[in-house]
Amino acid sequence: HKTIQFIVAALFIASACTDDRDNLMVNDQIGLLHSTYTETEIFRGMDTPYQLFVIKSGKGKQETEVSISVDETVLQSYNTDNGTSIQLLPSDCYTILQPALRLNDSDYRKAFDIKWNADRLSDLLSTGKEYGLPIQMSVVQNFISADDERLKTIIVPTIKEPYLQM
C-alpha cells in the first residue's frame, strides 16, 4: 500500500517539473552562410560544383523548404550601394543543379550546388569585366523565420589554372 502511495507521489512530483532547456534559446532562423558578396575560384578542368550553404540556427525543432533564384535586382542594389559595376552573369555560364532544398528538423546546414561552365566563363572573364550571379533565397514553407540580412548574395567567379606545388 505504501509502495503505491510512493509511486503516485513520485509521479505527481515529476509531472510538476518544468523544462527550462529552451528558455534562452531563440526560435529557428534560416539564411545563407555567405550573404551579400562571395568570391569563388573555378579551376579549369575540374568539375566540382560550387556549394552555396544554407544555415539553420536556433532551437532546431522546425523543418523547412527553401529555394533560390537568380534576381537581377539584387545585383542592381549591390552596385548602387557599393559604387560597383558588376554585370549579370549570362545563364549559359552556370547551372543551378537543385533550386530547392528541404531541411529536416535535425539539419543545421545544406547546400545548393551550382555547376559552372568553365570554358564559357573563361571567355567571358577574359574581357576584363567583373560578372556576378545574384541569388535570392526564399522560404517556401513558412514554418521558420528567415534572417532578412542573409537571404541575398552575389557570387563572383574567377577562373584559375590548376597547378601542382611541391
Predicted feature residues:
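Sec-dependent signal peptide recognition
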Residues: H1-A9
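Acidic/polar, low-complexity intrinsically disordered N-terminal segments immediately downstream
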Residues: T18-L103, D107-A111, R120-M166
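C-terminal motif of bacterial Sec signal peptides marking the signal peptidase cleavage site
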Residues: I13-A16
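Localized edge beta-strand/strand-to-loop motifs within extracellular or lumenal beta-rich domains
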Residues: W116-A118
